[in-house]
Amino acid sequence: MEKVFNFCAGPAMLPVDVLAQAQKELVNWNGLGTSVMEISHRSKEFIKVAEESEQDLRDLLAIPSNYKVLFCQGGARAQFAAVPLNLLGGNTKADYVDAGYWAQSAVEEAQKYCTPNVINTIIDIDGKKAVQPASEWALSDDAAYVHFCPNETIDGIEINDLPVTDKPIVADMSSTILSRKIDVSKYGVIYAGAQKNIGPAGLTIVIVRDDLLDLASQALPSVLNYGVLADKESMFNTPPTYAWYLAGLVFKWLKSNGGIDAMETHNRKKAAVLYDYIDQSDFYRNDVHSDNRSLMNVPFQLANSELDTKFLELADEAGLKALKGHRVVGGMRASIYNAMPLEGVEALVQFMKEFEEKYV
């Protein structure tokens, strides 16, 4: 079988070692004679999985003790509603920093429950998309919280600053969690869909500061209530146990490979290889200013867009999968999350060189 590298934006590739272990344990986990997906979420065996995975995540991110870690369902889109319904309290206003599609999607949902103050942060620098410095964001004084998405997967835009505010900061880290070091204590809530850097689709991680657990609207469904989920240790209803188990394997894989510091070094090296090649070429281009280029999602365009279909067709034949850009922006996009090895990025760059030589 040819070697395949999956550049899908999500669900994304998982570490090969994790998949191999899951395959080995699929029908007979821990000598029980059953799969881990078949056992009760309240069994002592699965409780151990749950406790270990939470502790490993706490270790990886250095999560302070005054934060709860919730293993939820519904994806990040469910959190677009859960955040205002959990955090507004008696307020009706919240700040939303807008740098792209996913921030805008969060705003659209939040409008059902509050009046968002939307701060458009995208600017143009030398013909490239960039993000305003956080010190220039027009945040309000009376917001319940400030929401932002540090990494916009579609445009490949990364926000490196934190909002300058004394309000709780809420971050949609679906595409950037575990890819680089963060200081969790600076956030009120962090949430992330699992299907990029954590595990398979179906699981969502929420990290929430204790003092924010008692603000929920009375109309909030219990399955989205952070306080309820914290009290029930993420088992108010049956959780996605197999996705939880796989996330636990990914956390152990990260720890065994040097943790977040090593992963950030690895990710910066991968991204540099790809961006450096694009920048020296007249055949390819990236439209994001270097200060705000994503480490995880690298969109690029061909000088001749009529060659897009041929590029994607030949790339697929070469084992370079899922490179088609999002329908909103077109072109190509290479998503190079934690599980993508440097070898995969180097293979993509080599293919790009050969394609350019043939079609320039």
Curated annotation (Swiss-Prot):
It catalyses: O-phospho-L-serine + 2-oxoglutarate = 3-phosphooxypyruvate + L-glutamate; 4-(phosphooxy)-L-threonine + 2-oxoglutarate = (R)-3-hydroxy-2-oxo-4-phosphooxybutanoate + L-glutamate. One of its GO terms (biological process) is L-serine biosynthetic process. InterPro entries: Aminotrans_V_dom, Aminotrans_V_PyrdxlP_BS, Pser_aminoTfrase, PyrdxlP-dep_Trfase, PyrdxlP-dep_Trfase_major, PyrdxlP-dep_Trfase_small. Its EC number is 2.6.1.52. Pfam families: Aminotran_5. Keywords: Amino-acid biosynthesis, Aminotransferase, Cytoplasm, Pyridoxal phosphate, Pyridoxine biosynthesis, Serine biosynthesis, Transferase. This is Phosphoserine aminotransferase. Binds 1 pyridoxal phosphate per subunit. The modification N6-(pyridoxal phosphate)lysine is found at residue 196. It is found in: Cytoplasm. Its cofactor is pyridoxal 5'-phosphate.
